Amino acid sequence: MEEIQRYLQLERYHQHDFLYPLIFQEYIYTFAHDRDYNRSILSENSCYEKKFSLLIVKRLITRMYQQNHFLIFSNDSNQNPFEGRNKNFYFQIISEGFALIAEIPFSRRLRASLKEKKIVKFQNLRSIQAIFSFLEDSFSHLNFVLDILIPHSVHVEILVQTLRYWVKDASSLHLLRFFLNEYCNSNSLITPKEVSSSFSTKRNKRLFLFLYNSHVCEYESILVFLRKQSSHLRSTSSGLLLERIYFYAKIERLVNLFVKVKGFQVNLWLVKEPCMHYVRYQRKSIWASNGASLLIKKWKSYLVAFWQWHFSMWFHPRRISINQLSNHSLEFLGYHSSVRMNPSVVRSQSLENSFLINNALKKFDTLVPIISLIAALAQAKFCNVLGDPISKPVWADLSDSNIIYRFGHICRNLSHYYSGSSKKNSLYRIKYILRLSCARTLARKHKSTVRAFLKKLGSELLEEFLMSEKDVLSLTFPKASSIFGGGYRRQIWYLDIISINDLANHKSKF
């Protein structure tokens, strides 16, 4: 974002967030394309990369300047100035530009807040694996958890109205509204099915994910406000990431909300619960508390009422499940997480007698979801549904070094992402599947057997790109690796991971 802002010359637009002229700048679409280019090696659809060119962007901008927007998205090839091009392709280009431009006000205000609060290492706050270190410290002392699936069916107009609090530029909002209505139809809802079918790649979904997250931020900011009003402690992280410039002007509306919801204002003591913890990623959110089951049930009913009254959206109570942490496993960020009892025996020796004391300590466990990972690998054609490795024919035409690089890239990413697993056996099985699938792909290319191929070239060919966890740790912490010795088998959380792994997220409904 720093490199982008050097080229944008936003100073004259800063006062009023006047972003409309940026929509007609070629470098906006170039930055948007380069930012996400080839991010995922699992993506085999290179159609967009082959079609993208600045000439197409120039023609598209010229058409937008002429304000003949309907001609851009017309199904009639006689009216479409870009014959032979898929209409979705132009939606894709424009959505990338919109997403990049809409993120500018958020980025500016976040950086201003960081500078004001003198927070230098913001990268650590961005890491999604920082959540697990928090869960390890907090969840082992809690009793109940609310597993929440946030509503996703949001009308286009609601998303645009939410964005108005951040972007004051009416021209940009009108063009965005027109674009969304043309794509999704004004009477339809943005659902995961529509997003996944119309925006089949992550790059296409970026705009809709941004709009959806800004909508959820509205809900989270109110919860942060309630928490601050009821507690003398101030959460630095929540105040930083969810701080809203316009929010305190909406307090009157918030009070009216509590008056409408029966019993909400009387029972506002709920938010004073000192051990209520909240985390979210995409549509999945978790509330945990050490309170009684009655308190958790009241929170569930109030959350449902909160969504229905404030957002005018139907929130089905079955979207919130109440579970006890001692016998429930959470599926969050690609991990199976649970709190289990870890028994330990301590011998106490006195002058005359000795005693054996049995202690049961709670431990937060994070496990690799082996079944879902094998299903993801089978869907990507690395193995069958039983987990038996197979060759990947679509990569057989690539060079040997390219094949090795692709398999090694996936293997290292999975090892990096699941380094926090309590048990490594499942991760070793995933490595085995990828290693043998790579060997079979190379053998298929050279029309040989796996055994003959490995005997001819040697096992070093595969070992050089499948880096072990010990090697990763020694590269990351060169001084500490010699001290810890075998400690690389322990849980390690990396603060450079800012998004969930593609294979770990293949079952995501969003």
Curated annotation (Swiss-Prot):
Its main subcellular localisation, reduced to a broad class, is plastid
Q: What does this protein do?
A: Usually encoded in the trnK tRNA gene intron. Probably assists in splicing its own and other chloroplast group II introns.
- Which InterPro entries does the protein's record reference? Domain_X (IPR024937), Maturase_MatK (IPR002866), Maturase_MatK_N (IPR024942)
Gene Ontology biological-process entries: mRNA processing; RNA splicing; tRNA processing
Family indicated by similarity: Belongs to the intron maturase 2 family. MatK subfamily.
Molecular function per GO = RNA binding
> Which species?
Gratiola officinalis
Cellular location(s): Plastid, Chloroplast
Keyword entries, A-Z: Chloroplast, mRNA processing, Plastid, RNA-binding, tRNA processing
Tell me what this protein is called.
Answer: Maturase K
| GO annotations of cellular component type | chloroplast
Q: Which domain of life is it from?
A: Eukaryota
